[in-house]
Design a protein with these regions (language model features):
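N-terminal small-domain helix-loop-helix segment of the aminotransferase-like
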Residues: 2-96
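Conserved core of the PLP fold type I
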Residues: 60-169
């Protein structure tokens, strides 16, 4: 399938979290919004059609995952990572990364435990840690030779204070 990644889409004044919050967050409107994982490509026509078809139904209750969802997950895991997963093992397939990390933190830690997160990072990770009653331990990433790297000395020093989990994203 060919796709047009070159046509710019103006998302200003569309209630876009990425493009319409710069004054609120940064106090200026000339910021290049690389702070949120949001793509600026037009949605693929097949996705638009599927959403429109579902939206045409008058009731928006909770839905169940259908077999095509599980087939897509199993196919992706096999193609991308070379391993096969049984359908039964996907019974608890979380709906997103933040949800999955939240469940993991609740299983591996208890309120009051220390959780280390490298900075800068994705804002919802911090909220997930603190709203769950865990103590956020920030460790700075270091900009070196044009890329971010870990400050292992800082991480080791902070881990010695009783950090239970290091969240990498």
């Amino acid at each position: 399938m060919r796709y047009d990644f070159d046509t710019p889409i103006n998302r200003r004044n569309t209630f876009s979290f990425k493009w319409d919050c710069d004054m609120d967050y940064f106090g200026r409107d000339d910021v290049i919004p690389m702070w949120v994982a949001d793509m600026d490509f037009a949605c693929a026509p097949c996705v638009v059609e599927a959403v429109q078809k579902r939206a045409a139904h008058p009731v928006y209750g909770y839905g169940m995952r259908q077999q095509p969802y599980y087939d897509a997950v199993m196919g992706w895991l096999k193609k991308r990572h070379g391993f096969e997963v049984n359908y039964e093992h996907l019974a608890f397939a979380p709906p997103g990364v933040i949800y999955a990390l939240n469940v993991m933190l609740r299983i591996l830690t208890k309120p009051g435990d220390r959780v280390m997160v490298p900075m800068p990072n994705y804002d919802p990770l911090f909220d997930m840690v603190t709203r769950g009653g865990r103590k956020l331990v920030e460790t700075p990433l270091v900009w070196k030779d044009g890329r971010y790297t870990f400050d292992f000395a800082d991480m080791e020093a902070k881990a010695a204070s009783g950090v239970k989990v290091l969240v990498l994203s």
